[in-house]
């Protein structure tokens, strides 16, 4: 399996409306206010983004019970973005194309975004802390040491923790690029999914999987799908390496075209249970909304599990 080169580079998100005032900060989920914030992407049956809907078109359900919407807006909100890049041996001939796509994503994002880079193989390394300097991001992405195995889950978990500790923006996004199944992480998929749901981080994944290794590819796809779907992001599996640029642009558009929806749960009990969340859309052509699948109702939003420490080099 490819060793993951931890390269998390910032994703720019939020939806731009012409001549709008500077966006306000997003509401934050806290145990006292119990405000749950959702970032929802809406697409029609052809997969095209739908960006002109009003609040009346949306309904939010928690465990099947409709919730009153407290905040609804669509703005180009700067994000805290991480690029997590596989740097295992099998990525050696793919890195240059992947790096170019990652930089294109950053350039297509909000200029006020903050971005960091994580490269990973057997271990994950924070090669560039938060920055808005495209040259520094380019240098960190170029730290190629393609060898060893793949610790994708640990790289993503480390990146989630880094976002929680260091991000100055409320909206948080990760892009993971890997070409193989995780074979070196200490953390489990279950705990990673929990962390993603609790952190409000949108996770996008690009899997450059080898179809000749079908069993390995299926395992890798299952993990990438799980973390992307749980967080409200999306996973992509290009058939050709040349498609990565197009996917990066698509991810940028997705992030910048999302609705911000927040509600105060009717059920205020902090019992640690999982609360399933669904956003339903009533509009012509039957569009559908994609957002995180739920959250855990506990003041301590971090699952109690061993976490990989942030490593610098």
PLM regions and their residue ranges:
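Hydrophobic h-region of N-terminal signal peptides that target proteins for export
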Residues: 10-20
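Bacterial N-terminal signal peptides that target proteins for export
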Residues: 1-11
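Scaffold/interface architecture of coatomer-like assemblies
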Residues: 19-313
